[in-house]
Amino acid sequence: MSGAHFVSSTFRMCVITCFVHMRDECIELSLTCKPSFSSIFYRVKLPILITSFPMRFLFFFAVFFACTCSSAALAAVHGKKHKPHQIRTTPFGPRAELAQLASDISQDQQIPVAWVRHQLSNARRVQGLEKLMMPPPTSSPKNWTAYQARFIEPRRIEAGVKFWQTHKEALERAQNTYGVPVELIVGVIGVETFYGQHMGKYKVLDVLTTLALHFPPEHPRAQERQAFFKSELGYFLKMVHAQPKGQVAITGSYAGAMGWPQFMPSSWTRFAVDFDGDGRIDLLKNPVDAIGSVANYFKAFGWQTGMPTHYPAQFDEAKLDKSTLLAPDILPSFSAASMQDKGMVLTSDAQQHKGNLALVELFNGSDSPSYVVGTENFYVVTRYNWSSYYALAVIELGAVIASEIKNAR
């Protein structure tokens, strides 16, 4: 047996290692690609007879050359995967629907129709947006454990600690003003935008105009959702019209949510506050305004100061009536006593809870579901995003960051 080892040249952090064995008139070729973000291993056996030294030398040289070329090719492939997402748009063109849309928005929002027409004439249709609006296939089971791991992870926790430390005064002032705990505000901004790092790159005008005119008709709530985005487009244009420069080149998520807290235009209009007192509301670049606005949002939806968001859930299987407990979904509908009558085993704190409670079920793929007992405040958190998975991720992220802050003192 004889062997040779080659390392190709690097290309974009990609290195291919080739190891050649000659055994039993067979050449065994091992290729390992180790870019910084992955490791791929290939092994190929080539039944080839090479008896002379010059032929072996030529073969090894050919392998080395192939490795060098493959390195570049593989690196290019990996680089392609990591390119930023390209947003493709096309013109709407002159259409009667745009004129009617401008007329409706002008009437609803009391802004000049000529100005609205001009703004909509600059809007472009976002390609592929309709697919993003469709609900996930039913074949994709929900998984709380996987969802939780996306948000409760070291980098986001570290960023949350820095955000808390940097904006300690504003966070505590928001808590004192609105009664909403610091950790909840920090949790929301962390889940929504990774503390301002991911605020979206779609032009909000393009997104909302596209969805107002081309919401996918096969969506189960197509009519309702299309009306919602038409309304949001109106709020957005009114918001822009009120600004001194009337800038419409604001970017956000593929649904039109904007800024540090990812407010939709209607939420910006109703709940955004000038929390730093500089005379203007800015959720795009001013985290202090975002802090006050998130707290104001929760207060407006009925946050009750001092009330927990949830309690642990345990069951008395002998008398458990789970179907009845789950029927109202996450809407608090049962007193503590009623829950216990239906088979819940509540902690002493939960037993003394004055308001209604809900049994919240979170699926874990093929594994057993997780459960918590949600309070009215848990339900309030779901008004920010109508998902119990989202609400619990926000709550847990904030709690972990609060613990890190406490331990650092």
Question: Where are the regions a protein language model picked out?
Answer:
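Cysteine-centered motifs
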Residues: 14, 18, 26, 33, ...
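Boundary at the C-terminal end of the N-terminal hydrophobic targeting segment
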Residues: 71-75
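An acidic, Gly/Ser/Thr/Pro-rich helix-cap/linker signature
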Residues: 76-166, 172-175
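Short, functionally critical alpha-helical segments immediately adjacent to catalytic or ligand/cofactor-binding
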Residues: 116-127, 181-196, 236-239, 294-295
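Secretory-pathway/luminal and periplasmic proteins that interact with or process carbohydrate-rich
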Residues: 125-132, 193-203, 214-219, 242-248, ...
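Substrate-binding/active-site groove segments that recognize
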Residues: 205-217, 258-273, 294
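Acidic, glycine-anchored loop motifs typical of Ca2+
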Residues: 274-283
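C-terminal soluble interaction/assembly domains
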Residues: 316-409
